Amino acid sequence: MDHLAKTFSACTVTASGLLASAVVALLALAGPAAVAAPAASASATAAASVAPEAGQAAPAFRLQDQTGEWRSLADYRGKWVVLYFYPKDGTPGCTTQACEIRDDIFAFRRANAAVLGVSVDAVNSKKGFAEENNLPFPVLSDTTTTTTKAYGALTSYPQYKLFNISRRDTFIIDPQGRIARRYENVNAEGHSKMVLAELAKLQK
């Protein structure tokens, strides 16, 4: 409980959005320990949003990054791609995850891997998030949720009036554009190193 209290004290929220922002922060930090949606809602989300499996072609996408530049999966053909989905810009868990990737970025580059973050936040939100945390990789805006849904990472928590947000899922995509590894509902802390270790195994 002390840990969660510290988490929420670190979040800046408006009075009108206090409850929703607090819940997003909890979900963003907690990873697999996040509060689960009711079974019926989870089933409905799963039915509408099915993740591609290892060996399948990664769904194509074209999204704007924090600078407004359009990025597509095809741009990275011939490279490994780490495509990670996260719930919301600026929340504690999402910031931790992004900053750990930032600190490991040279290791990803040595592994011939591009890192792309995705959430449903708008481009202006991405810009602030990237600038505040000096992120040296693209964070992409999926406001239509099309890409998040294509990768099976779309979820909702109707009991908290939170709809169509990204779950913390990560996909490693090989240089031929196929899914090599999928992580679902991961812990933010330590995930960057886990992905680097998996990349090393896949590249042997």
Regions found by a protein language model. Give the residues of each.
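Thiol-/selenol-based redox modules, centered on thioredoxin-like
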Residues: 164-204
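A short beta-strand-turn-helix
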Residues: 50-55, 61-80
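N-terminal secretory signal peptides that target proteins for export/translocation
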Residues: 1-12
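Structural microenvironment flanking redox-active thiols in thiol-disulfide oxidoreductases
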Residues: 93-147
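Short active-site neighborhood of thiol/selenol oxidoreductases, capturing the structured segment around
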Residues: 74-95
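Bacterial N-terminal signal peptides
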Residues: 12-33
